[in-house]
Amino acid sequence: MAKKALINRNLKRQALAKKYAAKRAAIKAVINDSNATEEERFEARLRFQSIPRNAAPVRQRRRCALTGRPRGTFRKFGLGRIKIREIAMRGEIPGVVKASW
């Protein structure tokens, strides 16, 4: 089980990313616009720097919903590999069966 602080920190980052997503996209559009003047692009860069660092989606970590484990997490289920195996063995995930060939 991951520390509660790490799980909460990740949730906070997700909330910040959602809150600032539109603002980040608008500012990045100005920064990447080749038709904008250098002054406009510079001002946009300054505004971009004022956005919190944790608002960047890159800083989020995909974690297991049950344990908070940061590695070995399947996107399809949102669970870590260990929990997927435990739940699948109990037959609680529809359509998932143990492989045999």
From Swiss-Prot:
InterPro entries found in the cross-reference section: Ribosomal_uS14, Ribosomal_uS14_bac/plastid
Top-level taxon in the UniProt lineage: Bacteria
Entry's Gene Ontology BP terms: translation
GO molecular function: rRNA binding; structural constituent of ribosome
A Gene Ontology cellular-component term: cytoplasm
Alphabetical UniProt keywords: Ribonucleoprotein, Ribosomal protein, RNA-binding, rRNA-binding
Function: Binds 16S rRNA, required for the assembly of 30S particles and may also be responsible for determining the conformation of the 16S rRNA at the A site.
Family: Belongs to the universal ribosomal protein uS14 family.
NCBIfam families reported for this sequence: PRK08881.1 (NF006477)
PANTHER family associated with the record: 30S RIBOSOMAL PROTEIN S14 (PTHR19836), SMALL RIBOSOMAL SUBUNIT PROTEIN US14M (PTHR19836:SF19)
Assembly description: Part of the 30S ribosomal subunit. Contacts proteins S3 and S10.
Name of the featured protein: Small ribosomal subunit protein uS14
Gene responsible for this protein: rpsN
